[in-house]
Design a protein with these regions (language model features):
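Bacterial N-terminal signal peptides that target proteins for export
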Residues: 2-11
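Bacterial N-terminal signal peptides
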Residues: 11-20
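Sec/Tat signal peptide C-region and signal peptidase I cleavage site
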Residues: 21-27
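C-terminal subregion of chymotrypsin/trypsin-like serine protease catalytic domains
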Residues: 28-61, 67-72, 93, 97-112, ...
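A conserved glycine-rich beta-strand in the N-terminal activation segment of trypsin-fold
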Residues: 76-78, 84-101
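Chymotrypsin/trypsin-fold serine protease catalytic domain
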Residues: 173-176, 182-287
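A short, hydrophobic C-terminal helix/tail in secreted or cell-surface proteins
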Residues: 360-378
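C-terminal membrane-anchoring or membrane-association module
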Residues: 375-389
Length: 389
């Protein structure tokens, strides 16, 4: 009963929103227009910087990756999903990560055409999925767009927020998909080994994606720092709490499937205030938040020499203003989905269960698991809406 009550209390804590961004549907090249609106009520992708007047000061420009082959994030890609559904042409931007020369991992909701887990059919006229590599400057071999030859979705994914748990929770489990490239990725783009072990409260992660940015004081800035297929940003955070397998009623003995973190600054610490989970607040120029367009992006662990793909970025919890300090975020842990990933990639991905020393910036005060942390009533799902450009 205690776990069930905790889930109910958290129902109003988390509103998840799509991190994918709408884009002009008839574009022949992968470019996103400015002023894009995003999904409300379910989760959104991006890396938001700290306080512009903090110590040290920060800005979205400080978080931009150089897009070079030597960047540790050269294998983090942007994705353009285009399809016609109900006679309406749609186009979206998401992020993803290269795990083998022909395979990119992203979020399942990026490839879902109707919110029920219906996979985009790329054999139909007007439908395609294109992956943009940014491992070099324009005209260099590391910058290339590759069209997908196949797409796959975790079979347990039935739509964003749809939960296998027998009660009316809104959960974000199983949100993982694989894109098969029509040709090999450029050699300039890094491939990443997938972490298959457990994670704990207090561990440091690095998040990378192509979403909207902004700062922790004023939140998302869709005018000056909109999502862009060729601008990726990175930032760090600390793992706070986790959730278990919804197909197994979030039983404590079931695998961890979701991770949660919060965007701390100016005295605002979401999980410390609401749950008593008080992990370390990172430096102003390190702490980050995700946002619209980061969906499917990378959550890495770093052991001092190599980045390992721990999971994806899939949802946010609104701050006030949205994307500011006090917001929450999270994604899926790939350790729970190794069987799916190996099957979808023909077994060519490389997994590792132990990676040596991982920086742990804060002492964990509490680890909450099996609580249905993103749980919300059915009425929350009814509020999900897609805002077009």
């Amino acid at each position: 009963m205690k776990a069930r009550k905790a889930s109910a209390a958290l129902a109003d804590l988390f509103l998840v929103l799509f991190l994918s961004m709408s884009q002009a549907a008839d574009a022949d090249i992968i470019e996103i227009p400015s002023g894009a609106a995003l999904f409300g009520g379910t989760g959104g992708p991006l890396i938001v910087a700290g306080d512009p007047n903090g110590i040290p000061p920060d800005s979205p420009d400080n978080r931009v990756d150089p897009n070079t082959p030597t960047s540790p994030f050269s294998g983090v890609v942007s994705i353009n999903i285009r399809f016609v559904e109900g006679g309406v042409a749609e186009s979206f931007l998401c992020s993803g990560t290269l795990v083998a020369s022909r395979y990119v991992v992203t979020a399942a909701h990026c490839l879902d055409v109707d919110g029920t887990g219906k996979l985009v059919d790329i054999t139909q006229t007007g439908n395609d999925v294109r992956v943009a590599f940014n491992a070099g400057a324009l005209g260099e071999p590391g910058r290339v767009n590759i069209t997908a030859s196949a797409v796959s979705m975790n079979p347990n994914f039935e739509g964003f927020g749809v939960c296998a748990f027998p009660e009316s929770f809104l959960c974000i489990n199983d949100d993982i998909a694989v894109i098969t490239l029509g040709q090999d990725a450029p050699v300039e783009a890094k491939t990443y080994r997938v972490f298959s072990g457990d994670v704990t409260t207090g561990q440091l992660i690095t998040m990378v994606g192509y979403g909207v940015s902004g700062n922790g004081v004023t939140g998302y800035d869709f005018v000056n720092y909109d999502a862009d297929f060729h601008i990726k940003r990175s930032g760090q955070n600390v793992l706070d709490v986790f959730d278990r397998d919804d197909e197994k009623n979030f039983a404590l003995a079931s695998p961890q499937e979701n991770w949660f973190a919060d965007f701390d600054g100016l005295g605002k610490d979401l999980f410390c205030t609401t749950l008593g989970v008080c992990t370390q607040v990172l430096a102003n120029d390190k702490e980050a938040m995700i946002g619209p367009g980061d969906s499917g992006g990378a959550a890495f662990l770093f052991n001092g020499s190599e980045y390992f793909l721990m999971g994806d970025l899939t949802f946010e919890r609104f701050g006030d203003p949205r994307g500011s300090f006090g917001s929450g975020m999270g994604g899926n842990l790939f350790s729970a989905y190794i069987d799916y990933l190996e099957g979808a990639t023909g077994g060519v991905i490389e997994t590792v269960s132990a990676i040596g020393t991982v920086p742990e910036p804060g002492t964990c005060t509490l680890m909450l698991i099996g609580l249905g942390l993103a749980g919300a009533a059915t009425r929350r799902r009814g509020k999900l809406r897609k805002v077009k450009l």
